[in-house]
Amino acid sequence: MAGLGPTFPLHRLVWANRHRELEAALHSRKHDIEQEDPQGRTPLELAVTLGNLESVRVLLRHNANVGKESHQGWAVLQEAVSTGDPEMVQLVLQYRDFQRATQRLAGIPELLNKLRQAPDFYVEMKWEFTSWVPLVSKMCPSDVYRVWKRGESLRVDTSLLGFEHMTWQRGRRSFIFRGQEAGALVMEVDHDRQVVHTETLAPALHEPEALLAAMRPSEEHVASRLTSPIVSTHLDTRNVAFERNKCGIWGWRSEKMESVSGYEAKVYSATNVELVTRTRTEHLSDQDKLRNKGGKTPFQSFLGMAQQHSSHTLAPVQQAASPTNPTAISAEEYFDPSFSLESRNIGRPIEMSSKVQRFKATLWLSEEHPLSLGDQVTPIIDLMAISNAHFAKLRDFITLRLPPGFPVKIEIPLFHVLNARITFSNLCGCDEPVSSVCVPNSSSAISASGSPFPCEVDPTVFEVPEGYSVLGAERSEPLRDEDDDLLQFAIQQSLLEAGTEAEQVTVWEALTNTRPGIHPPPRVTVFEEQLQLEQALQESLQLSTESRGPESPQKTPPSPAPPSFEEQLRLALELSSREQEELERRGQQEEDDLQRILQLSLTEH
């Protein structure tokens, strides 16, 4: 290793791709494998960016962290995709899934142990997807997650499984988590097919070599990533501020209070919440760029999923450069903390488009609600957020420093025309009785458990229903993150946190080796829905045109050819915007009139 310099020895070996010496240095355990160089890269990030496959292989064998994000918010896997090297992507993807599975094996029992220490309860979480666009709001579904918690056992029922091929997927499913001494048991109950899939989560049951081998992705899997844009979407809450909502008219305004599920709640607005979406395409061929740009349906374009393509201004490429070092940066320049690279960088020149949108989230907080956000609700959201993008966004939001109180209702943006509204209700069956939940006499129960709102949950709700077939019980098949069949959809929807690679899948698809969307809806269903949407647009446009004037039909010139679907969608959006502006204008005018009347009445006295 002589001549490589005293600082950043692992990085310098990676720079030169001297992988045998790198192996020896890592075996000595004298160096920090996660140390960052002056540009903020770990040895693994540097090796991937430079395309040094042999060094990447050595670092991954020594358990370098694949989940780390760069200071710019890009994951190691995303940087691997940007190289365009299929072998690099396959290797990084395999180790990423391996490290995720290992973390889940240890993490889920820990979350269940947290639940064990909290009082038992039953609660319902109503998810409503809302939009300010009328046509979209009609297509938005709602779902109620029913949650039972007893000891370290948890059951979550849902009927909304996901969103695939532009249709919402329905089905009655239960996800049951049961803590055990050596780990945890996870069951997915498909009530429609009366089938139960089981998986035992225990590190002792999975040999690392077998687990790693099972994580090897298919060639199609790798190819789909290499022919799709790299997308990072995240909520930026660094500048978020919480303000109390006001109600009343001028001169008599007060802080807003609302009753939610029987609890008085203070209403807050969270301002300066930004949704940042970035898309990279430098790894795509011209054909792939055209396909991804033109492959979006008119409805997807209407929802704002089409991004404008732009390239970053880069330093000129030099003759002595390589594809992964286009500006011929030397090792001395790169590793010198006092040397400024300015616009020069290593790796492929980045082609990136970005969109920043500002939103206002709303919170209804009740200080008298008996549930504990940290002890009872957060572990559940953590369990569901392992693989569900909606829960992941909810988790990121509730981990902020919220004002005091339990969030009985939350409204957060998912992307710029779609919000999610989550309401906690029917706590312990107090609003609507639940057969599996019993609330004892308050006096004796409170003294026994110390909980302000205790309830008893029937243990049979965590058992396999009678007559159901059990598949995969105690199987040795490892966990697998099978989110990639949904990757293209997730990119188009911008409903994922690609910075941490939390794409949208159901819990069981992320915990087991089950492929998502095994039975996708037939294409005719999607086509029929688009026809229905187009028909609705035509009717709404026709009605709006007829209402504009009393022109007789005899004087009407021959009607031109019907507008395209894209044009109809554009017109519908314009009409929706006009109607919204008109409503706001009328509301403002009414408030101004009220203020004038009040001022006049005050001056008369």
UniProtKB/Swiss-Prot annotation:
SUPFAM superfamilies: Ankyrin repeat. Its main location: membrane. It is found in: Cell membrane; Late endosome. Coiled coil: none annotated. Keywords: Cell membrane, Endosome, Membrane, Phosphoprotein, Repeat. One of its GO terms (cellular component) is cytoplasm. GO terms for molecular function: ubiquitin-modified protein reader activity. GO terms for biological process: negative regulation of receptor internalization. PROSITE patterns: ANK_REP_REGION, ANK_REPEAT, UIM. It holds the Pfam family ANKRD13_C. Residues 576-589 have a biased composition (Basic and acidic residues). It comes from the Eukaryota. PANTHER family: ANKYRIN REPEAT DOMAIN-CONTAINING PROTEIN 13, ANKYRIN REPEAT DOMAIN-CONTAINING PROTEIN 13D. This is Ankyrin repeat domain-containing protein 13D. The lineage of its organism: Eukaryota, Metazoa, Chordata, Craniata, Vertebrata. The gene is Ankrd13d.
